[in-house]
From Swiss-Prot:
Residues 1-25 form the signal peptide. Belongs to the plant LTP family. This is Non-specific lipid-transfer protein 1. PROSITE patterns: PLANT_LTP (PS00597). It is found in: Secreted, Cell wall. It comes from Arabidopsis thaliana. Gene3D superfamilies: Plant lipid-transfer and hydrophobic proteins. Expressed primarily in epidermal cells. Disulfide bonds join 29-76, 39-53, 54-100, 74-114.
Length: 118
């Protein structure tokens, strides 16, 4: 399991360096990934959601107020989920906002059409 966490951390570092997917949004994937980094262990291994994960989700929700920023956040989250691969528990990831008391305007899922997020 330590190898999985090392791989997840390496992927996260690459995603932070990669930056934004689109140029219409002020929000970068680096910012999204930084805010959600504390959630990786939970979505891969389960257990208790770390308080830092909830803080990151709340912060990300507060900075992603415009439609382009929300769409960008959605795209970044999907990219991170794809990078984590089969080790990702989609149900855990989808449940984080509610567990953290955050209402986001879209479902956390790789099947979400980010273009429809408002």
């Amino acid at each position: 399991m330590a190898g999985v966490m090392k791989l997840a951390c390496l992927l996260l570092a690459c995603m932070i360096v990669a930056g934004p997917i689109t140029s219409n949004a002020a929000l970068s994937c680096g910012s999204v990934n930084s805010n959600l980094a504390a959630c990786i262990g939970y979505v891969l291994q389960g257990g208790v959601i770390p308080p830092a994960c909830c803080s990151g989700v709340k912060n990300l929700n507060s900075i992603a107020k415009t439609t382009p920023d929300r769409q960008q956040a959605c795209n970044c989250i999907q990219g991170a989920a794809r990078a984590l691969g089969s080790g990702l528990n989609a149900g855990r990831a989808a449940g984080i906002p509610k567990a953290c008391g955050v209402n986001i305007p879209y479902k956390i899922s790789t099947s979400t059409n980010c273009k429809t997020v408002r």
